[in-house]
Amino acid sequence: MAARGRRAWLSMLLGLVLGFVLASRLVLPRASELKRVGPRRRPSPEGCRPGQEASQPGGARGDARGAQLWPQGSAAEGVPRDRNFLFVGVMTAQKYLQTRAVAAYRTWSKTIPGKVEFFSSEGSDTSIPIPVVPLRGVDDSYPPQKKSFMMLKYMHDHYLDKYEWFMRADDDVYIKGDRLESFLRSLNSSEPLFLGQTGLGTTEEMGKLALEPGENFCMGGPGVILSREVLRRMAPHIGKCLREMYTTHEDVEVGRCVRRFAGVQCVWSYEMQQLFYENYEQNKKGYIRDLHSSKIHRAITLHPNKNPPYQYRLHSYMLSRKIAELRHRTIQLHREIVLMSKYSSTEIQKEDLQLGIPPSFMRFQARQREEILEWEFLTGKYLYSATDGQPPRRGMDSAQREALDDIVMQVMEMINANAKTRGRIIDFKEIQYGYRRVNPMYGAEYILDLLLLYKKHKGKKMTVPVRRHAYLQQTFSKMQFVEHEELDAQELADRINQDSGSLSFLSNSLKKLVAFQLPGSKTEHKEPKEKKINILIPLSGRFDMFVRFMGNFEKTCLIPNLNVKLVILLFNSDSNPDKAKQVELMRDYRVKYPKADMQVLPVSGGFSRALALEVGSSQFNNESLLFFCDVDLVFTAEFLQRCRANTVLGQQIYFPIIFSQYDPKIVYSGKVPSDNHFAFTQKTGFWRNYGFGITCIYKGDLVRVGGFDVSIQGWGLEDVDLFNKVVQAGLKTFRSQEVGVVHIHHPVVCDPNLDPKQYKMCLGSKASTFGSTQQLAEMWLEKNDPSYSKGGSHGSARTA
């Protein structure tokens, strides 16, 4: 027993000694070597490996800059981005180097996992900050057959062993580098592959391209891709291909050369027509017009975009799509965090709880009738709303239409995600009807009834119309703030001080942010003088309203001595019985405030608001700020400051959405009305969303858009006409609810002699001023339903 125990101990000891010896001989030298060499690093974000030069032969300069436009994970998942993966040669000409070539270099070239060079004629300008390769012995003549072949020879001679794939592209194509990389990584570059959109020629060219039955070529416009093996086989024979050409089409001849010497031709695949997109629209103008299309999303290359602004437009759209995808990914991560926290018993952060709540129409539970979020009914063209202040039916504006198109497109992409494996495809036909609402806490919600076409292409082929209900939500992502310019605290404090209202106290705190002046500095800041506002009031009759307006003007402008000028555009017609009293009232105010800038300007003829404002504005120069006002309004000093801030000469016009009072006899049910005109409730009034008469505009911009249509008589239409002119002139319109202006209720009298359009608008305006829908309904029920009890449960149920 003792001998057996000693043998066991000796065996264990011998094993330990042998283990240490083997470790010292095998493991330690390897660890020392790794320590000397240092850790292997992944490619840097700019695409250059440690020790690798940024520039390559051929004139490329800084091709790795801007590679951070797309995330590193945008390639095939799990595969590091290889900057020596793809070489793109762009055919251009000297006359396009400053335009198309620069646009391509600044947009899609940054997404290519490799190198991009622009090939032009001999003697081309190489001082342009893009990688230009002037091809020796090549000119810019069209068709560019020699240029195309010599570019391929250049690729072969300089880069054959450095890149796996080679692409011939036009300068008016757009390439999605991340999508292209994912596609090419699924293929073997060691095999002879010739990729692009398969072409046979136009109907008129059939039989004239020297193509045998079954032969084809890759169309040059959307781009042509060659594997390294194809380029290796055909490049040595380029001279022979140049001498033996049968057509003037360079893409046909390149395809012929590849087929003859590489032994392959353009792949026969319907999918290539979608991946390499060519715009076949009738009357095409050289650019891709409709970006909100599934074709645009599926494509890898898009052609043509001959005008550089449209290239930048397309790139901006692609970046916005990428941002949307990243935002959606963040929402998914927040949801995963919330889900995992339930299993790990960890505390959920407030942000995760807000953004990670799963999709549901019950995310918000209303506790009162007023909190219920109502749905808007929609069809393909119109929105129907029961919201106070909104018309019962209105056409969809461009933003709403665009949003709906994007939603439908995303739905169809989800439905057809596995269409190939299922042997069917579903096409969208139209929206039968739907519902829409916006939850301010969580996002937009839709219920859509869709008419679709079910197309089965496996087994028994069939096409069947089907209807499907889609319940959709667009969740809000995290709020972000972006400062386009660095904040100047001193300038901001000065702008706040211009306002004599309650906000001026804020500037005292902001001044603490301003850098201290050096000792002995003589600099003294002077507050800029605020811009004078010229208030124009067309007036005919309405003396009582004029008295109230002048009382508000005195309190708001005259007593604080604000920098404004009041111009009363007084009509001299016999139909104005109050003319003498109005002139007398203005005289009294001028005596009381001799330094105030006030003027009465006579206007002849029958009343025309357009004519009066045109006459009044003619008194000012182009730098004057005009405020088109009415006598039945009251406004505050804060509004005047916003009038200045929201109106920019040559750029922006302010069309405030003002609050209009309901009839106080209905609102207060015969009781004494409140003296506070600025009470904003659903019961007291509504926002005039479709009124454009109250305007802040510079005289120069008024002249630029063509001024008022003085042929319009009476009230109405002149404001809509001016608004349309502003939009058509390309000026920005600023629209927002304005709490500093209130339209005081007064009886509306519609003259039957008005133009039919004006008369209809007048009747609509009159009907909207009686009271809110809920209050009018309650009044009707009180008179016609004896069982109705205001405020009771029965009444509440009936009016909800």
From Swiss-Prot:
The record's free-text note on cofactor binding: Divalent metal cations. Highest activities are measured with Co(2+), Mn(2+) and Cd(2+).
Catalysis performed (reactions): 3-O-(beta-D-GlcA-(1->3)-beta-D-GalNAc-(1->4)-beta-D-GlcA-(1->3)-beta-D-Gal-(1->3)-beta-D-Gal-(1->4)-beta-D-Xyl)-L-seryl-[protein] + UDP-N-acetyl-alpha-D-galactosamine = 3-O-(beta-D-GalNAc-(1->4)-beta-D-GlcA-(1->3)-beta-D-GalNAc-(1->4)-beta-D-GlcA-(1->3)-beta-D-Gal-(1->3)-beta-D-Gal-(1->4)-beta-D-Xyl)-L-seryl-[protein] + UDP + H(+); 3-O-{beta-D-GlcA-(1->3)-[beta-D-GalNAc-(1->4)-beta-D-GlcA-(1->3)](n)-beta-D-GalNAc-(1->4)-beta-D-GlcA-(1->3)-beta-D-Gal-(1->3)-beta-D-Gal-(1->4)-beta-D-Xyl}-L-seryl-[protein] + UDP-N-acetyl-alpha-D-galactosamine = 3-O-{[beta-D-GalNAc-(1->4)-beta-D-GlcA-(1->3)](n+1)-beta-D-GalNAc-(1->4)-beta-D-GlcA-(1->3)-beta-D-Gal-(1->3)-beta-D-Gal-(1->4)-beta-D-Xyl}-L-seryl-[protein] + UDP + H(+); 3-O-(beta-D-GalNAc-(1->4)-beta-D-GlcA-(1->3)-beta-D-Gal-(1->3)-beta-D-Gal-(1->4)-beta-D-Xyl)-L-seryl-[protein] + UDP-alpha-D-glucuronate = 3-O-(beta-D-GlcA-(1->3)-beta-D-GalNAc-(1->4)-beta-D-GlcA-(1->3)-beta-D-Gal-(1->3)-beta-D-Gal-(1->4)-beta-D-Xyl)-L-seryl-[protein] + UDP + H(+); 3-O-{[beta-D-GalNAc-(1->4)-beta-D-GlcA-(1->3)](n)-beta-D-GalNAc-(1->4)-beta-D-GlcA-(1->3)-beta-D-Gal-(1->3)-beta-D-Gal-(1->4)-beta-D-Xyl}-L-seryl-[protein] + UDP-alpha-D-glucuronate = 3-O-{beta-D-GlcA-(1->3)-[beta-D-GalNAc-(1->4)-beta-D-GlcA-(1->3)](n)-beta-D-GalNAc-(1->4)-beta-D-GlcA-(1->3)-beta-D-Gal-(1->3)-beta-D-Gal-(1->4)-beta-D-Xyl}-L-seryl-[protein] + UDP + H(+)
Binding residues for a divalent metal cation: D632, H746
Side of membrane Lumenal, spans: 29-800
Alphabetized Pfam families for the sequence: CHGN
Annotated segments matching region Disordered: 36-66
InterPro entries according to UniProt: Chond_GalNAc, CS_glycosyltransferase, Nucleotide-diphossugar_trans
EC supergroup of this enzyme: transferase
GO cellular component: extracellular region; Golgi apparatus; Golgi cisterna membrane
Annotated family: Belongs to the chondroitin N-acetylgalactosaminyltransferase family.
Protein's name according to its UniProt entry: Chondroitin sulfate synthase 1
